Amino acid sequence: MKKLTYRKIQSFQAIITVLVIFASFYLEYAAGLQPCPLCLMQRVCVFILLGLMGVSLGTVKKAHIVSLIQFQVACAGLYFSLRQLWLQSLPSDQAPACMPGLDVLIQYFPWQTVAKALFWGAGDCAEVTWTMFGVSMPGWAAMYFLSMAIMGLFLFFRTRTIN
């Protein structure tokens, strides 16, 4: 059996992450789904993860630190996706009120309101607009972030004794 190395694992994760990014842009531009604030935060986490994987492919030095940061970013993405799943599970009368688009929020509202919408979500985050095999988009995102967090933690413990 071939040995799984740090770079092979990170390369595989980078390929999965690129596929997730392509899927998110496909759903936005080809399928016409507008991302809610929590979706945007999840996308930011995916881009940060891809950047970390790119850094880790360049050098194996400090791989344990990169893996720990990868774990933390994946946990942040997991928070955003679980928050959105929770909002989607609320009855319609308990869901938060819809807010204007992010561009309008940034232009006309104070930064505290923008930050609250980005970190806590809004009414449009509670809408289920797309499912695959009965699982909504934040459910798939939660599975992705959970797998990235587990692999980040695994790589952290595996590489901290090497470096």
UniProtKB/Swiss-Prot annotation:
GO terms for molecular function: electron transfer activity; protein-disulfide reductase activity. Residues 27-44, 83-139 are periplasmic. One of its GO terms (cellular component) is plasma membrane. It is a multi-pass membrane protein. The chain crosses the membrane at residues 10-26, 45-58, 65-82, 140-158. InterPro entries: DiS_bond_form_DsbB/BdbC, Disulphide_bond_form_DsbB, DsbB, DsbB-like_sf. It is found in: Cell inner membrane. The keyword Transmembrane helix applies. Residues 1-9, 59-64, 159-163 are cytoplasmic. One of its GO terms (biological process) is protein folding. Keywords: Cell inner membrane, Cell membrane, Chaperone, Disulfide bond, Electron transport, Membrane, Oxidoreductase, Redox-active center, Transmembrane, Transmembrane helix, Transport. Pfam families: DsbB. Disulfide bonds join C36-C39, C98-C125. Required for disulfide bond formation in some periplasmic proteins. Acts by oxidizing the DsbA protein. Belongs to the DsbB family. This is Disulfide bond formation protein B. It comes from Legionella pneumophila (strain Lens).
